[in-house]
A protein has these predicted regions:
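Cys-based phosphatase fold recognition centered on the PTP superfamily
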Residues: 1-7
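Flexible gly/pro-rich beta->alpha loop and the following alpha-helix that scaffold active-site loops
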Residues: 3, 12-88
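Conserved G/P- and acidic residue-centered "switch" motifs that form tight phosphate/ATP-binding loops
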Residues: 8, 90
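Pocket-forming structural segment of enzyme catalytic cores
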Residues: 71-87, 94-150
Length: 150
C-alpha cells in the first residue's frame, strides 16, 4: 500500500489536492491511503514514525521562513526518508526552496487567478500533459531563481 501524507498549511485548496490525488491513485489501481494532517497537529517524530512513501506539502498563507505558517514542514524537508518522494505546491514549493538554501521574495507582479502556459519535460507530475498547458497561478511570493542551489 502506498501511504501518502498531505500536510495542510491551513489552505482551502488542500482538499482539492486530496480529491485529485485520490482520483489519480484510484486510476493507478494501486492500493493507497492519504492522511491529511495540519502542519501543527502532529510532531515530526510522530509523522516520521508513520513511514509515509509520499509527502505533499500544501499551499498556505505566509512565508515558509516563519514557523507559524510552515509548522512541521521544515523538519520534513530537512529529514526526508531515503525513498520518500516529496512534492511542494505553492507554499510547499517555496518552502523547499527556502529549506534548501534559496531565497523566497515578494514577486514583482503578484499572480492571483492568472493563467500561464508552461513548458515541461513530460516526466513525473507532467507525464501525459501537453506542452503549453495553461495553469492557474495564485502567489505573491516566488523562489528567487538565482538563489536556488544547482
Amino acid at each position: 500500500m502506498i501511504r501518502i501524507l498531505l500536510v495542510d498549511n491551513y489552505d482551502s485548496f488542500t482538499y482539492n489536492l486530496y480529491q485529485y490525488m485520490g482520483e489519480v491513485m484510484e486510476e493507478s489501481g494501486k492500493p493507497f491511503r492519504i492522511d491529511v494532517v495540519r502542519n501543527d497537529e502532529k510532531s515530526y517524530e510522530d509523522l516520521n514514525s508513520a513511514s509515509y512513501d509520499r509527502v505533499v506539502i500544501s499551499p498556505g498563507p505566509g512565508n515558509p521562513s516563519d514557523p507559524k505558517y510552515f509548522g512541521v514542514c521544515t523538519k520534513i524537508l530537512q529529514n526526508p526518508a531515503p525513498t520518500q518522494k516529496v512534492l511542494g505546491v505553492c507554499l510547499g514549493m517555496q518552502g523547499m526552496a527556502h529549506v534548501y538554501g534559496g531565497k523566497v521574495v515578494r514577486a514583482a507582479l503578484p499572480m492571483h487567478g492568472k493563467t500561464s502556459p508552461i513548458e515541461h519535460d513530460g516526466k513525473g507530475v507532467f507525464a501525459g500533459l501537453p506542452q503549453g498547458i495553461e495553469v492557474m497561478r495564485y502567489h505573491s511570493l516566488i523562489a528567487e531563481e538565482q538563489s536556488l542551489p544547482a
